[in-house]
Amino acid sequence: WWNLDDARYEIPKNGNKHSMFAGALWIGGVDAGGQLKVAAMTYRQGGSDFWTGPLNTTTATITPDECNEWDKHFKITRSEVEDHVANYLDPTYVMPDIIENWPAHGDPSQGQDFNLAPFYDAGQDGGEYNPYDGDYPDYNISGSNDNAKLFGDQTLWWIFNDQGNIHSETEAEPLGLEIHAQAFGFTADNEVNDMTFYNYKIINRSTLPLN
């Protein structure tokens, strides 16, 4: 929503109106020993509690190199996926890079979860993402996929965690969270056209339950 100096949450585009300066998740939990653990952010001027990338599912850790590798947003549109579903068998079809390289799976050498970015397994490849066999990022293209996990007409998807380094913002103990996030918007002829929405899947990768 901002670039560390100026507001960037501008809606509508080129309207020079910024309804938000900064925003972040604030998450806290208490373990069985009564220890409070927190991950939260304000303006990133005093530190950070969050870093990019998926955690090792066994150790709830991540290397700095992996954080850097995942320091990105994956931008996709529903129309790109609709076109892919309609034309992937056409020999003249050129598959968009975002569909071909959709981050569906984690890196097993880093202990990451096999399933990351959601996709529809149209080819029934045993859960392996293969867009050349008709698989696609998981919008409800058919109209009957009520379990679809991607929303909107344009979507930004990314992963972040609270284990990439010490919590220099709150100075609290980490929770061991891996968070799958998406920001999305719709093309509409009403107020929804000028809105954005957010969805977070919050996973506790630590070995301890938190309340």
Task: Tell what function each PLM region has.
Residues 1-211:
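A long-range scaffold signal marking pre-active-site subdomains of enzyme folds
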